[in-house]
């Protein structure tokens, strides 16, 4: 027997990346310094992979004449990186912090692992607020980060991308923005920092990504660079375009013709520096760039137009909505 799923089957019935909602707040003193950091995360579980549960997790198991119950997605243990919790704890030297994660058990669509799990959304959110705090003080975003990071390896990737991107140089023109984001994957894995340069016309175009990665001892530096570059391009697509569109009855995108995804003509110039650490243990490179890339692009958009977009993907419609919301707040 041979079973072949069509492209429509894959796009409409396969599990999707979990939805996430993140609420962050920081207590500041009269000088704008962080006294405490608070975060709450709501999300589906981030894995429903076959072989990890006591009952079958494949779709067909729930469609049999005598069906198995469809299991609820779970989060991997936090000690192994977690799911929705992944990178929910910021990598900054704050005096106090509290982070809570809530697993949403029921949603209309099946969810399972998407590359980097919760790190993509968590780093996007954390680095967005970090940038806003720095700007509220009138402080350079790179300088603010370096002032709140004591880990020398984290500082090294931030300093690398700042130097190679000519951070602080003059703007290239109207609609140009530059932003930075960084994280240590899972809080214990690879370090990655990204500077994004964007141009806004009728949509956001990422023109350049400058990346530094520290994976410990890089056995194959070219392979590491390829993994980081691929992850960054994929993250750019998620950040600007990709989303599951559905109505009350079905998933709307049933083929690549309508699904919003980054095209070859939209792929930015990507520059990757691998910081070799022969004295350190090797760690994975494949998921380090996702969160920092999203954060860098979002912060670059904020730099270009002065408006914070808090919902992904960053489409023209969401930029317009964020602009109207900000104007209403200041009116």
Spans of features found by a protein language model:
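Cofactor-binding beta-sheet edge motifs in enzyme active sites
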Residues: 1-331
């Amino acid at each position: 027997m041979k079973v072949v799923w069509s492209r429509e089957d894959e796009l409409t019935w396969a599990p999707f990346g979990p939805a996430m909602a993140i609420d962050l707040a920081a207590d500041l003193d009269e000088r704008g310094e962080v006294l405490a950091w608070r975060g709450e995360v709501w999300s589906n579980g981030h894995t429903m992979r076959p072989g990890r549960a006591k009952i079958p997790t494949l779709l067909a198991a729930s469609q049999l004449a005598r069906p198995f119950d469809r299991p609820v997605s779970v989060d991997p243990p936090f000690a192994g990186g977690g799911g929705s919790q992944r990178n929910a704890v910021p990598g900054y030297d704050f005096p106090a912090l509290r982070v809570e994660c809530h697993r949403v058990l029921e949603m209309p669509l099946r969810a399972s692992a998407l590359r980097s799990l919760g790190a993509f959304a968590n780093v996007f959110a954390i680095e967005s607020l970090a940038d806003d705090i720095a700007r509220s003080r009138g402080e350079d975003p790179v300088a603010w980060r370096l002032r709140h990071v004591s880990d020398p390896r984290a500082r090294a990737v931030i300093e690398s991308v700042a130097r190679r991107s000519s951070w602080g140089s003059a703007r290239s023109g109207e609609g140009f923005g530059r932003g930075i984001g960084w994280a240590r994957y899972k809080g214990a894995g690879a370090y990655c920092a990204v500077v994004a340069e964007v141009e806004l016309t009728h949509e956001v175009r990422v023109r350049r990504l400058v990346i530094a990665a520290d994976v410990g001892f890089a056995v194959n530096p070219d392979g590491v660079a390829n993994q980081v570059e691929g992850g960054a391009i994929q993250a750019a697509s998620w950040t600007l375009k990709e989303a599951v569109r559905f109505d009350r009855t079905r998933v709307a995108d049933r083929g690549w013709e309508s699904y919003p995804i980054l095209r070859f003509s939209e792929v930015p110039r990507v520059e990757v520096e691998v910081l070799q650490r022969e004295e350190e243990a090797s760690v994975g490179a494949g998921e380090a760039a996702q969160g920092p890339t999203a954060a860098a692009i979002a912060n670059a958009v904020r730099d270009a137009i002065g408006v914070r977009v808090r919902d992904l993907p960053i489409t023209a419609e969401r930029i317009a909505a964020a602009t109207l919301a900000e104007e209403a707040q200041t009116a």
